[in-house]
Design a protein with these regions (language model features):
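Glycine-rich beta-strand-turn "strand-cap" elements at beta-sheet edges
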Residues: 42-51, 76-97
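Short amphipathic alpha-helices within nucleic acid-binding modules
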Residues: 17-21, 60-70
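Active-site-flanking beta-strand signature of metal-NTP-handling nucleotidyl enzymes
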Residues: 4-10
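A general secondary-structure signal for short beta-strands and their flanking turns/coil
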Residues: 2-4, 52
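Structural beta->alpha junctions
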Residues: 10-14, 59-60
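Short, glycine- and small/hydrophobic-rich beta-strand elements in well-ordered beta-sheets
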Residues: 29-53
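Short amphipathic alpha-helical segments
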Residues: 15-38, 73-77
Length: 97
């Protein structure tokens, strides 16, 4: 069963938006979208919070997400999160059958 992961990245002085920009411009976003089992990977900027970025990340199943978490890209993502001193909040959702 597919599921969606919402990740809220929060920083200071525009760092969350810079993180999303660098993720996109570095090609990491396209690599993740090309991974087996990834169904959606998109960043959004809340209208009422300039210091937060929402990532909506959808996976076919837990196995696909586990493979993503074991990929080398996770080290790159973690390094960027550290570079921009971001805090994360994660929510997981499944479809209503």
């Amino acid at each position: 069963m597919s599921f969606t992961v919402n990740i809220y990245y929060t920083g200071k002085n525009g760092s969350a938006k810079e993180f999303a920009r660098e993720m996109t411009e570095s090609g990491l976003v396209n690599k993740i979208r090309a991974e087996e089992g990834n169904e959606r990977y998109e960043y959004f900027f809340p209208l009422d919070d300039p210091e937060t970025v929402l990532l909506i990340d959808r996976w076919r199943d837990q196995q696909a997400l586990d493979a993503h978490h074991k990929s080398e890209m996770m080290e790159e993502i973690a390094a960027l999160r550290k570079k921009y001193a971001l805090h994360m909040r994660v929510e997981r959702y499944t479809e209503i059958l």
